[in-house]
């Protein structure tokens, strides 16, 4: 009787041990980071690519010397979009590859002026988009835009 109980207990213990770890689990996709140009002192990348997805960091209307362009929301939005276009080009993509944007604005009353410039950069399609008011944008910017693009294979 004791032998049967011991065998039963051992069988139960083995059954509870579970499956061995799987070795055929899919590999984690590689992440490629696109460095900032001229901004090595900044603690973030211009974009990160995972497979065919390109995630751009938020961009503001700064020039190559990292100074905000003068003139308010219109010129800032134009420069922001040009900065986005340049990052996309470094990854072999264009604005036509953008599928989503998030717009942060210091003053939502400037919505119309921002939209007028923004829309000119997407004449063939309009990416999905969210927008909200935000305080404390970098360098006192009026607008910051981040995008996600579906990019051609590397």
Describe the function of each predicted region.
Residues 99-101:
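Surface-exposed aromatic
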Residues 5-9, 16-82, 86-96, 105-154:
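N-terminal presequence-like segments and the immediate start of the first folded domain
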């Amino acid at each position: 009787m004791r032998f049967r109980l011991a065998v039963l207990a051992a069988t139960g213990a083995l059954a509870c041990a579970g499956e061995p770890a799987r070795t055929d689990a899919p590999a984690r996709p590689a992440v490629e980071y696109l460095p900032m140009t001229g901004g090595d002192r900044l603690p973030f990348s211009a974009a990160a690519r995972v497979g065919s997805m390109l995630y751009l960091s938020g961009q503001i209307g700064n020039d190559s010397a990292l100074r905000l362009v003068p003139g308010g929301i219109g010129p800032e939005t134009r420069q922001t979009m040009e900065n986005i276009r340049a990052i996309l080009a470094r990854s072999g993509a264009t604005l036509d590859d953008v599928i989503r944007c998030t717009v942060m604005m210091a003053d939502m009353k400037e919505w119309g002026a921002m939209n007028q410039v923004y829309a000119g950069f997407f004449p063939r399609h309009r990416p999905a988009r969210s927008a909200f008011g935000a305080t404390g944008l970098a360098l006192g910017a009026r607008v910051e835009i981040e995008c996600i693009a579906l990019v051609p294979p590397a």
